[in-house]
Design a protein with these regions (language model features):
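Feature activates predominantly on carbohydrate-active enzymes
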Residues: 63-184
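Acidic, contiguous N-terminal accessory segments
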Residues: 1-113, 118
């Protein structure tokens, strides 16, 4: 039994055996944008490169929005998805599977979200978090496949966005995010 959060809504077919991720994981992007590898690469300490014949092959197919089919064999990994979000969720599952041990089980997982909107509300107007803390929250959201962040920045208790034309808005509440921090 696999301990995945959230549990896949589709099918999970386990087989005997396992495969280890190479030291540097190569990924064939296919028709997908490179940004969909960012969180995966960060979790593997940057040991991810794109290649024509990668250990992981991404294929664009007609399946549910944000859904994916992940196939792990001794020869490598295939991710089938309709969009970049599906790729992100599949690669999140790969990192979750490797967290259970050094090797990935030989498995095929079909998964798609039940709800299109899966989110978290972060009220930084009433309780300020640093930009680094917000980034950690976003990373944790990705790990459990949440796709919407409601970042509450303005209320009676505070104006948390730097406003260069009206600086008193943010200066009177003390702590705020610079425009550079918001952009990163």
């Amino acid at each position: 039994m696999l301990n995945l959060i959230p549990a896949p809504r589709g099918s999970v077919h386990m087989q005997e055996g396992s495969v280890k991720l190479p030291e540097t994981v190569t990924v064939s992007l296919g028709d997908f944008a490179p940004w969909c590898l960012e969180a995966f690469a960060a979790r593997l300490d940057g040991h991810v490169e794109t290649a024509e014949n990668g250990f992981i092959t991404l294929k664009k197919v007609d399946i549910a929005k944000e859904g994916y089919k992940l196939t792990v064999t001794k020869d490598g990994i295939t991710v089938e998805a309709a969009d970049e979000s599906g790729v992100v969720w599949a690669l999140t599952t790969v990192t979750e599977l490797t967290a259970e041990g050094e090797a990935l089980p030989i498995v095929t997982i079909e998964d798609a979200p039940h709800y299109g909107h899966r989110g978290l509300s972060l009220d930084c107007s009433r309780h300020f978090f640093t930009a680094d803390e917000v980034k950690k929250v976003i990373d944790q959201m990705t790990r459990v496949k949440l796709n919407v962040l409601h970042w509450h920045l303005v209320d009676d208790q505070g104006w948390r966005i730097e406003c260069k034309t009206l600086p008193l808005l943010h200066e009177t509440t003390g702590t705020y995010y610079t425009q550079e921090e918001i952009g990163s």
